[in-house]
Curated annotation (Swiss-Prot):
It is found in: Cytoplasm. The modification Phosphoserine is found at S44. Catalyzes the conversion of O-acetyl-L-homoserine (OAH) into homocysteine in the methionine biosynthesis pathway. Required to efficiently reduce toxic levels of hydrogen sulfide generated when the sulfate assimilation pathway (SAP) is active. Also catalyzes the conversion of O-acetylserine (OAS) into cysteine, the last step in the cysteine biosynthesis pathway. However, it seems that in S.cerevisiae cysteine biosynthesis occurs exclusively through the cystathionine pathway and not via direct incorporation of sulfur into OAS. Disruption phenotype: Loss of viability due to toxic accumulation of hydrogen sulfide, resembling methionine auxotrophy; cells can survive when grown at high density and at lower temperatures, simultaneous knockout of HSU1 exacerbates the effect. Increases expression of genes involved in sulfur assimilation, cysteine metabolism and methionine metabolism. Keywords: Amino-acid biosynthesis, Cytoplasm, Isopeptide bond, Methionine biosynthesis, Phosphoprotein, Pyridoxal phosphate, Transferase, Ubl conjugation. Optimum pH is 7.8 (for O-acetylhomoserine sulfhydrylase activity in Tris-HCl buffer) and 8.4 (for both O-acetylhomoserine sulfhydrylase and O-acetylserine sulfhydrylase activities in barbital-HCl buffer). The lineage of its organism: Eukaryota, Fungi, Dikarya, Ascomycota, Saccharomycotina. PROSITE patterns: CYS_MET_METAB_PP. Pathway: Amino-acid biosynthesis; L-methionine biosynthesis via de novo pathway; L-homocysteine from O-acetyl-L-homoserine. GO terms for cellular component: cytoplasm; plasma membrane. One of its GO terms (biological process) is cysteine biosynthetic process. Pfam families: Cys_Met_Meta_PP (PF01053). It catalyses: O-acetyl-L-homoserine + methanethiol = L-methionine + acetate + H(+); O-acetyl-L-homoserine + hydrogen sulfide = L-homocysteine + acetate; O-acetyl-L-serine + hydrogen sulfide = L-cysteine + acetate. This is Homocysteine/cysteine synthase.
Amino acid sequence: MPSHFDTVQLHAGQENPGDNAHRSRAVPIYATTSYVFENSKHGSQLFGLEVPGYVYSRFQNPTSNVLEERIAALEGGAAALAVSSGQAAQTLAIQGLAHTGDNIVSTSYLYGGTYNQFKISFKRFGIEARFVEGDNPEEFEKVFDERTKAVYLETIGNPKYNVPDFEKIVAIAHKHGIPVVVDNTFGAGGYFCQPIKYGADIVTHSATKWIGGHGTTIGGIIVDSGKFPWKDYPEKFPQFSQPAEGYHGTIYNEAYGNLAYIVHVRTELLRDLGPLMNPFASFLLLQGVETLSLRAERHGENALKLAKWLEQSPYVSWVSYPGLASHSHHENAKKYLSNGFGGVLSFGVKDLPNADKETDPFKLSGAQVVDNLKLASNLANVGDAKTLVIAPYFTTHKQLNDKEKLASGVTKDLIRVSVGIEFIDDIIADFQQSFETVFAGQKP
């Protein structure tokens, strides 16, 4: 099997296309709920996980399996599981590790939806999220205890764009027998970063973003590195070392070895909680994967050019992008990111003279710049082929209090830009006309 990313994104999971019933070169859409057993014995064997095959599409589907194998290959993982959304991927990834009374340790530099999920929803499940402000490896270790079941990071923090020191954090976590879970959404399916290469144990994605790439489909992925030694920690992770109450006494460590985790998540959590990815979504995401490297390359190139242009603009007070030497995590970005520095940046606009921003916060120059863009779309997504903008303080992080917003790196003047693959001069021209419209001849 070819190993280059550009080839893997086209062929992994479908190395022998002639194997399907009608020799279709495109991945077929298996729009079926269920699969016919050869006989009763065969059905029994499938339900007992004694032979490979398909039972019911809430557990497994041939179209989705191609997507799973392809993303696992691109990430350098052993296996993957496709689910209904990025939030579902995070939920199952953590619930496969932590139970009532357990805790996870996470950076505070998070997407607002993740922060809220960890802080509120996981608490209802009896799982405590302990937030470390920033990504200093030593700060994580300070809050570990015997019930810590995972460390959680984002490859490129949203919206601060910090790049954690993976190797140091992984070393500290593994010293305590704790697996590391990394949301690699901003790593674009492994194009900008492969966290498993640096020791991460489990990778999650909102496949909605760069993997799909066209703003058409919601989906999530969990990738298992297959490298964490679950057998070495039977008391810490009894769900793998003891007979499974929910699957006729199966001991996952014995039955599935290095794949114990991902099989457990599929056969029990996906089965019981139900956030499956439907085959139509898998098919659409596969269309995106086939051009992933081509799009991601352009996203990265355009983002760097726009960031450098914004740095020189008289209307801009600051720019945050890990590809800039001025960024606090630039050295980590150079170490851990490849093929570019990602497709998203943030910046702040200088104050508008005489704006009544205390009475009406939407009079802030940043909000007005967003409202006056014509090419870029003001919406809550990233990773689309088209340029997208948003003011996170008023939207994606709105549910956080002011202290939590600051801890996440969100300020009132922040504009987040998911840079598209349009011609860069057109993107720049759109921001320039918006600046000129908002300031209308006034000096910033």
